[in-house]
């Protein structure tokens, strides 16, 4: 199913649909992006409280439209955007994390050359895209380990 919803969000119908059904929609995306994660309602509800912020829908929709060049970015950050488009090498110590759910990108080789400092990549099996909640120990260990680099 991939990222189909980014195209839905590009439409006025997507904006209205997400605004009306943001909790159900988010739960669906959680299940799609992390199919093996058996989260309970309490876990979802803790995050879902943020969906009721008055600017939540506008921020989400703008983000997806901006990714598709359908909405402008913040002009005050244009200089940073230009620098990022050059794909600068990252010199700080880094640990990247992927999951076996990421398919060909899971092993990190596609972007490893972007790092010139001490670098390692960890592939976690059996999780989706919410590493901090699905694999909190492994995530925390990566933070601790990179601090020691």
Describe the predicted segments one by one.
Residues 1-123, 144, 149:
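Flexible "cap/lid" subdomain of the alpha/beta-hydrolase fold that forms the substrate-access gate
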Residues 127-140:
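Catalytic histidine-centered segment of alpha/beta-hydrolase-like enzymes
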């Amino acid at each position: 199913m991939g990222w189909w919803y980014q195209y839905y969000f590009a439409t006025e119908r997507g904006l209205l649909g997400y605004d009306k059904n943001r909790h159900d929609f988010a739960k669906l995306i959680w299940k799609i992006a992390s199919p093996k994660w058996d989260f309970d309602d309490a876990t979802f509800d803790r995050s879902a409280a943020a969906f009721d912020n008055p600017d939540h829908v506008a921020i989400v929709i703008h983000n997806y439209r901006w990714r598709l060049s359908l909405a402008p970015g913040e002009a005050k950050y244009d200089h940073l955007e230009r620098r990022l488009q050059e794909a600068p090498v990252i010199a700080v110590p880094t640990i990247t994390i992927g999951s076996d759910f990421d398919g060909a990108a899971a092993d990190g080789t596609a972007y490893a050359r972007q790092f010139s400092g001490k670098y390692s990549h960890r592939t976690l099996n059996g999780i989706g895209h919410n590493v901090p909640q699905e694999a909190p120990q492994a995530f925390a260990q990566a933070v601790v380990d990179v601090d020691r680099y």
